[in-house]
Each structure stands twice: as C-alpha cells, then as structure tokens.
A protein has these predicted regions:
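Boundary regions of SH3-family modules and the immediately adjacent low-complexity/disordered segments
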Residues: 74-110
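A cross-family detector of function-defining hotspots
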Residues: 66-70, 74-79, 110, 115-179
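N-terminal secretory signal peptides that target proteins for export/translocation
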Residues: 1-2
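SH3-family beta-barrel domains
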Residues: 21-45
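Sec-dependent N-terminal signal peptides
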Residues: 5-14
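Conserved beta-strand/loop element in small beta-rich adapter and peptidoglycan-binding domains
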Residues: 45-65
C-alpha cells in the first residue's frame, strides 16, 4: 500500500512539474536550436530543410492546441506541428515543443564553443569535429521516434520525407562522420 501511495505521489508530482512549464499563448520564448521550416511550417520530426530560423531567435506564441503551436518570428507566423511519428513515440506537443523552444537560450555558452561548433551552428549543419551539444544547437533534437536516447553513437535526422542524414560520434562525443 505504501509503495502504491508513494508511486502515485511521484507520478502526480511529475505531472504537475511538467504542466507548470507548459508553453502557452502569449509566451515570449527563444529557439533552443536552429529550426528548419518548410515555408511557414515546422514538423516535430525536424526535417533538415535549407531555410533556417536561427538559434536564440525571439518568438511569441500566438496559439497552442493539442497538435500544433502557432508562433510569430520577425512578423511572420509559423506553425510547429506534432507529426504522426513523434506522436506515435508517445511524445506530446508540449514535450516536442520544449525541445526546440524555451525561456532563454545560452548565448554565452555558444560563444565559448569551439570554432567548428560555431561554424556548424551558423550553417545549421553538422560537421566533423563538432560536439553533440554543437550538433543539437545546429540541427535541433533528432526525431524522437528514431532517437529515443541521445546517448548513442549515431543520431538519425530526416533531410526531408525521403532522405536521411546520419551523424556519427566517437566515444568522446565528437562528430566523426556525417552521411
């Protein structure tokens, strides 16, 4: 009985902690990585398209629903959409959005990163020699359904619906290959 009660309290505490951080209409946030929109839409699968909203960009949340978040960036409206693969991995819109948007990005930390990390972040692409953290800032979190753990030697991204990009790391967390 005690174990069940403690478990229920832990679950309830976890749920309220997550809900307290939920992104809501009117929030002013920053991008935690580069985003790669397809016109005015960003799918939570995080396609690596040529266009880019830079890391640390200021955005204002206009609307949040169960499956999408509308935000304003530099006077243009964008929509962050929960795709079926992310949803199938049991990730909510809030969880997915919080991987890419937050109250403040760490610009000072980015400026202290290596030259290769800074170049990759600026280009929005992974390069050999970058750190995991640099890749995360440059490309965003890899898709949840294909990368449930980030502590693996290869992250798989989708360039678009048909092509993938694999980023391989050595045991020190540095990129050894991008294919």
């Amino acid at each position: 009985m005690k174990v069940r009660l403690v478990s229920m309290l832990l679950i309830a505490g976890s749920a309220s902690a997550v809900n307290a951080a939920d992104i809501k209409e009117g929030d002013t946030l920053q991008t935690l990585s580069n985003l790669h929109p397809d016109k005015q839409e960003i799918l939570s699968i995080n396609y690596q398209l040529p266009s880019k909203i830079p890391v640390c960009a200021n955005v204002t949340v206009k609307k949040v629903s169960k499956g999408a978040m509308v935000f304003d960036y530099e006077g243009s409206e964008y929509q962050f959409v929960l795709d079926k693969h992310t949803k199938g991995a049991d990730i909510s819109l809030q969880q997915a959005a919080q991987a890419y948007f937050g109250p403040k990005c760490d610009e000072a930390k980015m400026k202290s990163m290596s030259k290769v990390d800074q170049e990759g972040i600026a280009s929005g692409r992974a390069q050999v020699g970058m750190t995991r953290e640099g890749v995360m800032l440059a490309m965003g979190r890899p898709p949840f359904h294909a990368n449930p753990s980030l502590d693996v030697p290869e992250w798989m991204y989708w360039r678009n619906r048909f092509a993938r990009v694999a980023v391989q790391f050595d045991d020190k967390g540095k990129v050894t290959n991008v294919r």
